[in-house]
Amino acid sequence: MNDACLLFPASKELDSQNVAVILADDMKHSESILQLGSGAPRKGFPLTSSPLLPMVTPWPFSQDHAAPTLYSLLVAYYKSFQSQKLDPPKWLWQCLGDPSGRKCMVTQFLLPPLGQVRISCYRNLTSIVICQAVDPWENNNEADWRKNPMARPRIKCDHALCFKVVYEGTLWRPHDQKCWLIRLTEGHKYGMEELSPGDWKILQESRPYPYGPIGEDPNLQYAVGVKMKVIGGPLTSTVLALKALSFHRVNICNMDNPSLGEGHAPLRYSHALKAYGPQYGSCEERVWQTATKCIGPEEENYWCEYDHRGFFPMVPNKLSPTWVRHAAPYCIQRFATPYDLQYFANELLPPGFSITTPKGVSYTSDRRLHYGNEGTLQEYNENCDKVKRGYDEISSSDYSDEN
């Protein structure tokens, strides 16, 4: 448990069953735990006042109730097969026991581009474990990757992607539920490292390639472009949660994108990645989060210790301190969808200018031209005269109607 600023819930807040499931199961690979949902501490804190689960996922999950999250998983599961004109296999449930000996109903399935999902339903608790590194079509899992660094998977299990969320309650309870978010690290249970090359091959052959062409399919954009841009950051869990919340807030503001309980990909991810911010953090982001009281003033409130990955140490090098790392300019990826390109054309280019893809498709900026700060004095005066004539025509028309 590396993130000291996130406190574990006291045992008196939970019954024995919850303690066994949340704390005892796979503690070794749990990065941190954050209480969310009903009754969460620090009311008004951005993470607890939002209904969104602060984890980077293809569509938003709920932190207030298990039902919207599970329903979105079910919808996405069926849509992923129907989009390929395949009959979706039924969810198979098994009655199993957890490490504490408690019985629960368990199902596990693969859902691109999200990853491997494991759902455990107890009498008064719902647990979901998601490993986003499991993608046999766009990630590699070679037999000797532990010995050969060059064979390591390009998308590893990381606390920015892999997580366990536990809701205190069942699907049929109408009121808001307590929720705990546990970030998981490399080697966690029910993750990629438990799959052998044979398992990987079976999953890969279980269905056709589920993604569309580069630059056209937002699912492929998420599977590669988004995951590669969020893993590996030497940032604390609170910082990652704040960045994930910004990621979802931008997406959910577009009415065409999925909301809570809707399991499908949005139109684009580039603007959400831009809101997510620098993958490895920056001094600008740290200053903003500190100034808004989202994190503490100490460096360890922003950067975390990742010695085993070769990133920044907890105590920075005086010749190269972490707080001088500036955010790099945001770049458009080749996975950007047509909606992304049109968005950036409108945002970055003057009216009439365009972006042309290698296939010859052009996206022309149609934003409004502001003559006050984008025109010459002559153009500005001509525009003022045009606006004045328009007002005069309206005034004369109203005067003639009155007569």
Curated annotation (Swiss-Prot):
GO biological process entries: positive regulation of DNA-templated transcription; viral process
* Listed transmembrane segments: none
According to the UniProt entry, where is the signal peptide? none
InterPro entries noted in UniProt: Foamy_BEL
Domain of life assignment: Viruses
Q: Say which family it is in.
A: Belongs to the spumavirus protein Bel-2 family.
Extra info from the record? Bel-2 expression is low.
What this protein is called in its record is: Protein Bel-2
Species of the source: Simian foamy virus type 1 (SFVmac)
Please name the gene that encodes this protein. Answer: bel2
